[in-house]
Amino acid sequence: MDDKLREEINRRRTFAIISHPDAGKTTLTEKFLLFGGAINTAGSVKGKANSKYAVSDWMDIEKERGISVTSSVLQFNYDGYCINILDTPGHQDFSEDTYRTLMAADSAVMVIDASKGVEAQTIKLFKVCVMRHIPIFTFINKMDRDARDTFELLDDIETVLGIKTCPVNWPIGSGKEFKGVYDRKTKIVSTFQAISTGGAKKAEETDYHIDDEALKELVGPYLFDQFNEEIELIDGATEEMDIEKVRAGELSPVFFGSALNTFGIEQFLNYFLKMTTPPIGRNSSEGIIDPVTEPFSAFVFKIQANMNKAHRDRIAFMRICSGKFEAGMEVYHAASKRKIKLSQPQQLMAQDRKIVDEAYAGDVIGVFDPDLFSIGDTLTTGGKKFEYEGIPTFAPEHFCRVVQLNSMKRKQFVKGVTQIAQEGAIQIFQEYTAGLSEIIVGVVGVLQFDVLKYRLEKEYGCEIRLEPIPYNYIRWVKDPTIDVTKLKRVSDVKKVKDMKGNPLLLFANEWVIDQVLQHNEGLELEEFRKN
């Protein structure tokens, strides 16, 4: 066994950050980069002409709207660890892309707004983490703003999400009265002070032991007494820390802080890195694949075309699951059943790219894609020909017919729509008999329609009109050999095919779905399909 290989893989930590929009996910991401030395100044405000854009928000439409539309991959070193952050879209309309990104993560950091508690998107993304049994760490952000009662916040997480919590630290006050956080293990209080620069630099923190008289004077007798009462309560009322339960995704360690003011970030990072694990074995068609003892293998979880105007190309993002990647190596592509060389391997810090000579299990690399890869594809070496578990495609919830305004640009239009669909931002469906002469687009959230229109115009020079169609539900026909043209009671149903030729049915409401199932014995419908 190569000791360097084991050492490199063991120092990897690969995680995603999930949250509801505006909970502070992008700000927290930037502060991690700040501590890792990957950036010198955090662009703390997005969307204003006089401010920097967030490092992780790089597409034009993201800059205009101040939202993370695509998923970026950010790597940096900190305290001997090599950290890979899978920065997921924070906007509620981009949960399917976020879902695929969570398939590549070993753990998740859940950011919660202290004034709001658990919100809709948090619930949806949390369920994905539970499905994968990955550890979930909670960072309750914006403690320096008006916040809900701390015990209420913990109860909210446990009741709504159904996961036990264990506070690692505890806040002293909140809002204008926020004085700092108490580390339950070391009994040290780190005091808070707002930073006039908006947290663009690392905050100066003063530490006091809980028994230090100076702390009581600083906090004030009323707040100090209230804090001591709360500490007695949590010692008896909350779960004890159990690292095995944490790693099984059954117990969430909770931290408090203010990402904007760079407060509580370093403490969180230090605990998080020690409590999480390096990459672990993944399930495949040949059982669990060990990350250290098995040769290089990876799977594609995202495809992005035309990442910026200087690079008219298509990049496949792949998560390395085992072994070591070396530039120029030949790999077996399971889907096409042939050997290929991975071209132009690179790691990305948003728009900035660097060519990589080597990478290890836990890392994410982007490789040039000659229209070969699809989401979920497995790559192997060493004579192995297994496949990792497929990534499900979830049923979209909004549908439009795409009308091309300039028939002379048909070729660019079809190429653009197809490429954007292969990236996973949209799903394309064709009329069952009409083929590509009529294209229906399905999306998880309506903002993706704007992204499609914007990208077709800016990147492919095609203007389109989107016409809503009166359907809200889509289901895959489980048995693709069924002739959907012979189904009964389908006058209000639209029959379509996906890009792989699988038959689907579009419905106006759930009642119609029930009627079709009742009148077609043996028909089974699915809400998602594995790639």
Regions from the language model: what does each represent?
Residues M1-N531:
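Structural and coupling elements of P-loop NTPases
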